[in-house]
Amino acid sequence: MRYLIPLGVFVILGAFLYVGLGLNPRELQSTLLDKPAPAFNLPQVNDSKQVLKKEDLLGKVSLVNVWASWCVSCRQEHPLLMQLSKQKNIHLYGLNWKDELTAAKGWLAQHGDPYKASAFDPTGRTGIDYGVTGT
């Protein structure tokens, strides 16, 4: 009898482990499906007196790219974003995530700025609201 409780706990933990190991860690279900986009109001990278807000994106199909000067994969995708920015039917916006403003400005100056506007999110709060877990 004294072994039944630890055995039961072990079996339950083993079942959770078995189910958890079967899940794909790359598949994250979006918490925003069928919900309105969260509101935001952030200064722009290139002009902190100007703001970018959710309302600026309404009424048109927009692509919002989350990027940072320290992000390696952002450097790889940047040439594609530069090409996309030349197409008239794509509204491309950036969300600079957890970065330093001077580094972000320097990165855009060095590599080119494909965005109609890029919001500056130094704390990462807006990115988290949109489900960003990394760049």
Range-by-range predicted roles:
Residues 90-103, 113-124:
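Thiol-based oxidoreductase modules, predominantly thioredoxin-like and allied folds used
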Residues 66-83:
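Conserved redox-active cysteine motifs that mediate thiol-disulfide chemistry
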Residues 83, 103-110:
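Short alpha-helix adjacent to the SAM-binding motif of class I
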